[in-house]
Amino acid sequence: MNLRVLPILIVTSCLGACTTLQGVLVPVSQGATGTQQVDMLVATTRQRTEPAEMFSGARGSALSYANIRVSIPPASARKVGEVQWPQRTPGNPATEFVTTKADVIDRPQALAWFRRAVRTTPKRRVLVFIHGFNNRFEDAVLRFAQIVHDADAPAVPVLFTWPSRGSVLAYGYDRESTTYSRNALESVLRDLSQDPAVSEISILAHSMGNSLALETLRQMAIRDGRVAPKIHNVLLAAPDVDVDLAREAITDMGPKERRPSFTLFVSQDDKALAFSKGIWGGGARLGAINPDAEPYRTDLAHSGVNVVDLTRLRAGDSLNHEKFAQSPEIVQLIGRRLAEGQTVTDSRVGLGDRIVQVTAGAAGAAGTAAGLVLSAPIAIVDPQTRSTIGGHVEAIGRGVADTVRPW
């Protein structure tokens, strides 16, 4: 185990535990002007507990559902990429994330809610989020609400939350809880994909949640002959997954043309994954690799996995483990791609140009000309991008010319 990283993780976990109130999901009775609402479906393998908490970190005996509506404070009261946690209960909707609805529902009610939501959503797309290690139920709910709001993607939000203890000392329990939840996640994905109104499904997994996502999709492919065709995009954010296991899981899903498009978000300065690497005896974690180094460069190219390297992007968290959600540029980039029904590295619409814009914004925030490194297939810098890249480079310094490069 990396003993230099462990104290950081323990302190971070303790700070979160000490500052998190009980009952933050209890709906408030009054709203505030200028707020926006995120209405989500929740599917969980957690055990039901008292109403103020809704679901605990224990494992439930069956799949449960909830419908939760989160109120997001006005833009003037918050920073994109951050969750404004209540300082006391009830929270203040003018400045903090609060719920206006939090109902436990049964499966027929969940499917009915989903059918209504899909049919009133433009282009009828769905976004499924799978959280990572050390997440309480309320952590997962409010973080997903932040992602959905800040990404501004017109998609039906579905949270799949598995039994995490919400403790840095429960790593083994959390890991086995992802295995425990595979069948349930597969059932949820099958239900969503079988709705005839759904056009496509994207999956966004974070940290340890990537293990659950990959193993579930692998299991689905083996059971059904392929991953459900409506599952188009899988976004792997800071995956706490062994590199070899990830490669085998994707391979087992079948040929590239019969499996989803995968986008991998990595950061070589991720301290949480450094901790995980120590626990697993030094095995490389997928979310912390150098995509330009062998054998990863060749393996990723062979698998057709797109890579976004966030190593030089400064994060809001001390562990550099949530850059995908805390960086305004990245979370909005994800939202635009999902809104347009394309992969995060689709070159046909000049995505390279948009990423240079993201780089410019990140560079300004970080005070460096190379605020963000992006590694992606060479096709990302398409003709449309090349025609406009010069202006962006001039805006942030010549050094940015090296930050968008072929992988």
Predicted regions and their residues:
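Bacterial N-terminal signal peptides that target proteins for export
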Residues: 1-7
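Short substrate-entry loop that stabilizes the transition state in hydrolases
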Residues: 136-140
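The conserved beta1-alpha1 loop
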Residues: 128-132, 206, 238
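Lipolytic serine-hydrolase domain surface
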Residues: 23-103, 112-113, 118-121, 141-157, ...
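Alpha/beta-hydrolase fold active-site loops
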Residues: 125
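Gly/Ala-rich beta-loop-alpha elbow adjacent to hydrolase catalytic centers
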Residues: 185, 205, 209, 213
